[in-house]
Amino acid sequence: MTGCIVGWAHTKFGKHEGVELETLIVDAATGAMVDAGVAPVDVDEIYIGHFNGGFVMQDFPASLVLQAHNDLRFKPATRVENACATGTAAIYQGLKAIAANQARIVLCVGVEKMTELNGAAIGEVLTKASYYREEGGENGSFVDIFARIAESYFQKYGDQSDALAQIAAKNHANGAVNPLAHFQKDLGYAFCREPSDKNPLISGPLKRSDCSPVTDGAAAVVLADTTTAMGMDKAVLFRATAHVNDFLPMTKRDVTQFEGAAKAWHQAYDRAKIGVDDLDVVEVHDCFTIAEMLIYEAMGLAEKGQGASVIADGVSTKDGKLPVNPSGGLKSKGHPIGATGVSMHVMAAMQTRGDAGALQINGAEIAGVFNMGGSAVANYASILEAVR
């Protein structure tokens, strides 16, 4: 697939009381078109990423994007869903439309409104992104799923609590200077390391500081074919994309390694003709701190069982060899399911153009994005580079 991101917009992530789903959609869509300098009449197709699953009563949201401008009326609009990778799935559908010469300019929006439900109801919705008959309902919640992953990893490779606390502290420190982040507070390593009344154990070895928050928000990008993009004010090229799905049941996989994630990363490297050492910055799917550590191994920063060394050696810190999640990641920025993948691409695109403000990594030219659905079931890896 070829194509470029030529504009973007991003609402603040957090709890948006009294703000309707359609307001988040319209704000992000409008902002992205304005940022790209694209008139609504010139948009050829629309894709919206929205997991929902019961967070809000409004399903079938695709045509809500049309409310951003009357000139979007009668444009083809389609909802895309692939669990927590829903946002990237929407972007990839847009890229496919461009690659197939069915569209020249595509608007992609990701959105989720999660906070209207109580905690138990939210947990029940989220477990629908697992193999429900074995992993959901009475069998546990989504945090229980990643707690089992952590426990299995600890049993095989030893206690990794220090590394998980370092990852949490890193991402909160990064998010503290991100004005769009849900949490903008540097918690520090000591707080993240030890259980306390304010940071209790939630499941297995995972504490509250190991878990991404329940969040509302939206993000949007405008995509264009490469020829069109080169005539616009900014263009961030997809040098490569890769999408790999693994088995849904955890019982059919070795949960101490993200094999689907590794395949997606290495397909992306091969297609971009680069290696992990060529990346300058990455945004990865740290829904739980154990996920970020396993992604270190999947992307080739460490051998199996050695992911802790990446954070211990400072490789993934903001001033390290390969900064990971300078935005604060899902852990601090927030994880509104359908918006997450789009948000990650916005954050990475900003880095490649030097537009990331306080989040900017000096000299960042090539960015990686890894967004996953479920427990490394749907795996999406993108390699981005600014060409304008």
What are these regions (language model features)?
Residues 1-85, 149, 153-160, 182-192, ...:
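Conserved active-site "lid/cap" helical segment
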Residues 6, 32, 43-46, 87, ...:
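Buried hydrophobic positions in well-ordered alpha/beta secondary-structure cores of metabolic enzymes
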Residues 41-50, 76-82, 106-111, 162-169, ...:
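Beta-strand segments within the central parallel beta-sheet cores of soluble alpha/beta enzyme folds
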Residues 53-61, 250-254, 286-308, 320, ...:
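Short glycine/threonine-rich loop-to-helix capping motif typified by GTGT followed
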Residues 81-112, 144-178, 221-227, 333-356:
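Active-site-proximal alpha-helical scaffold in enzymes
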Residues 258-262, 266-289, 293, 298, ...:
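Extended C-terminal subregions enriched in glycine
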